[in-house]
Structure formats: C-alpha cells, structure tokens
Amino acid sequence: MLTAEDKKLIQAIWDKVQGHQEDFGAEALQRMFITYPTTKTYFPHFDLSPGSDQVRSHGKKVVNALGNAVKSMDNLSQALSELSNLHAYNLRVDPVNFKLLSQCFQVVLAVHLGKEYTPEVHSAFDKFLSAVAAVLAEKYR
C-alpha cells in the first residue's frame, strides 16, 4: 500500500519524467531486451535495434500509461483495466514481464535522476510499479 509520503515522492519524480517519456521508455525497453532477451518474442514485428521508431513509440506508450497510473494511484484497477485486458486476452503477455520492465524502468530513472533518485524514492517507486504490475496481472487469474 502506498503511503501519503510515497505518493508525494512518486508525483515529484514523475514531474521530472515529463518531456522525457519517449527517451525513458525506449531506454527501459532496450535494457529489458538486452537483459532479458526472451522478452523480444512479444515484439516479432518490431525493429528492435536501438533507437528504432517502433521501440521509441512503444516506449512512449508505456511511460504515458504509467503517467496515467500516477494520476490514478488511488484507483489503479480502474485506470489500468483496458491495458490489463489487452495484455491478458489479446497479447497474452506473461505477467512476469511487467516486473522485468519495472526493474529496467527503475534503472533508467536512477541513471537519469542521479542523486534525486534517493533510497526513499526508489522504495516508493518500487511499491508503485509492483502495484501496477499486480493490477496488470489481475485478469490472468
């Protein structure tokens, strides 16, 4: 459960993500593809080379979806319902991949935000992204 302080930290850091959605998202996806190469199987029609338009576009979609989740921290299930349906029923993405991408996104935040990505921010974001991953996996049950 996110505390009021967690929510405050998440919102403050998210304000710094604004304007960098495409870059941060593409970098997180690239890190995931390199670190967990089996995740590439969900993107057979993509040019997965670094900086490709498809990876950048999808990265932006991912980060924008996280932005919507930040705006709806108190009602993640409703905010992510359509996305959960899409990944569970249409794309059939193994839910473990949500956690893998979450880890990669946190690395991107730490790299770009440096000292601002404090242990407290890391903890808050970890809880938030774990909650997002859990909601996205709800439809699999």
From Swiss-Prot:
Q: Which GO terms describe its molecular function?
A: haptoglobin binding; heme binding; metal ion binding; organic acid binding; oxygen binding; oxygen carrier activity; peroxidase activity
A GO cellular component annotated for this chain's UniProt record is: blood microparticle
Which terms under GO biological process does the entry name? Answer: hydrogen peroxide catabolic process
What the entry lists under Pfam families is as follows:
Globin
InterPro entries named in the record? Globin, Globin-like_sf, Globin/Proto, Hemoglobin_a-typ, Hemoglobin_oxygen_transport
> What keywords tag this UniProt record?
Heme, Iron, Metal-binding, Oxygen transport, Transport
Q: Give the domain of life.
A: Eukaryota
Q: Where is the Globin domain?
A: 1-141
Q: So where does heme b get bound?
A: H58, H87
Q: In which tissues is it expressed?
A: Red blood cells.
Subunit info? Answer: Heterotetramer of two alpha-D chains and two beta chains.
Q: What does this protein do?
A: Involved in oxygen transport from the lung to the various peripheral tissues.
Annotated family: Belongs to the globin family.
Q: Please identify the protein, giving its name as recorded.
A: Hemoglobin subunit alpha-D
